Amino acid sequence: PVAIIGQNGAGKTTIVKHFNGILRPTSGEVLINGEDINNRSTAKWSKEVGYVFQNPDDQLFLESVRKEFEFGPKQIGMPEDEIQKRIEWVAELVGLKDKLDMHPFDLTSTEKKFCTIGAIIMMDPKAVIFDEPTCGQDVAGNIRLREIIRQLKENGKLCITISHDMKFVVDNFKRIIVMCKGQVLLDGPVEEVFAQVETLKKSFVTPPPITKVAQGAGFKETVFTTEAFMKVFEERKGK
């Protein structure tokens, strides 16, 4: 899984919308598995790269959760029996098993977000892009998101997530890309990226609180949990 972070206006959403042709480059090339993005329509690319909009209302348009789940797979020619099998699994995964016949706009804001996530996963793309999935989520929602990302990874899918929630980022992603003003400033393992204090300041990214405390205390190690902080603290105290 990969997280893309940076301040508002850094270009995060713009760049990921190029990954399945929602946007097209005005210069240069965007290659997906070596193929130019301009070689296919957005509809064709949706089989490869699924994009979950930040605002669910921009994505939902049918009269039931079930129909939202069925729509994409039908458009790409997925067999009906496979669609029905996937509905069972996806509905359970996103927590909407008992709400398949509800109108999406009768769902809570959190449930609507999971409805859009489910609709994209239904199409079985090789990569799934989440745009600010934690926005408006409670603790239970974040736990469910973590499980969704874990299962996607387990199934060999690439998960790319845009997020301002640094706690969620460090808990769930090993590779981090930092953007600022349309440029990639950092791209690497989470520990290395959050060790680049000055570059993070330039990109207006604030590390998780415990990480900031450790850096302020002069720790050379980059820590993300209280347990890791205390371990380093005790080791330093012992010296």
Show the residue positions of the predicted features.
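Conserved ABC ATPase "signature" C-loop
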Residues: 181-182
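ABC ATPase nucleotide-binding domains
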Residues: 199-239
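Conserved ABC ATPase signature
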Residues: 103-107
